[in-house]
């Protein structure tokens, strides 16, 4: 979902963050701090997120602002896709989460699948790199790139009650459960089915 006001607020936040990192003039630093506060209030309003939550999100952000990276594992078994039930909202998503410092994207996919679903997987190939704002997600304070990695199931067993998840299942594309649209949309799940079944090696890029 592309909302101009929210996009503009994110750009203002990025400019102010860079200015606070590299600026030297005291008056300019005050102006950058004011811009940062304005951007936080704008993002809170347009994303319907509490101001304190948005401020907390950016409290540790310094230097040149860059998009966050969300990594999702795409795992098929008998033409059904692995989904986990999110404890946060009770809806379902592909196993995954934010990229971790020190880990490769493939390592994150393996780690998140084990932690959230209980299964051991082997990364096979990259399916897609999508820009979250170009898809029908709820508004978000963050600019996010989403990486989808096809993985082969090699072991483990379902984890029914994890730290962040409360259920695990394999679902046919015509029988999907309620999805956690903050994390993945129905269109994206359908797209992952198509890309995973394809013999072509082309990666889908926004």
Task: Give residue spans per PLM region.
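Nudix hydrolase/Nudix homology domain
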Residues: 1-32, 91, 158, 163-206
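Unchanged
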Residues: 99-122, 131-188, 192, 204-206
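Acidic, metal-coordinating catalytic segment for phosphate/diphosphate chemistry
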Residues: 27-29, 33-72
């Amino acid at each position: 979902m592309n909302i101009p006001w929210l996009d503009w607020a994110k750009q203002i936040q990025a400019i102010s963050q860079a200015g606070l990192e590299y600026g030297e003039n005291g008056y300019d630093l005050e102006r950058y701090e004011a811009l940062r506060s304005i951007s936080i209030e704008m993002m809170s309003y347009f994303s319907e997120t509490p101001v304190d939550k948005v401020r907390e999100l950016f409290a540790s952000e310094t230097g040149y602002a860059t998009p966050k990276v969300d990594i999702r594992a795409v795992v098929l078994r008998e033409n059904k896709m692995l989904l986990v039930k999110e404890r946060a909202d009770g809806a379902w998503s592909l196993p995954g989460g934010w990229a971790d410092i020190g880990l490769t994207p493939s390592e994150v996919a393996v780690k998140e699948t084990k932690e959230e679903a209980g299964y051991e997987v082997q990364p096979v190939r990259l399916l897609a790199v999508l820009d979250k704002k170009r898809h029908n997600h709820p508004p978000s304070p963050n600019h996010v790139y989403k990486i989808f990695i096809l993985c082969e199931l090699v072991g483990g067993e379902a984890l029914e009650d994890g730290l962040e998840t409360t259920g695990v299942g394999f679902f046919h594309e015509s029988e999907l459960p309620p999805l956690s649209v903050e994390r993945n949309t129905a269109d994206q799940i359908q797209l992952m089915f198509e890309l995973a079944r394809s013999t072509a090696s082309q990666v889908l890029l926004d």
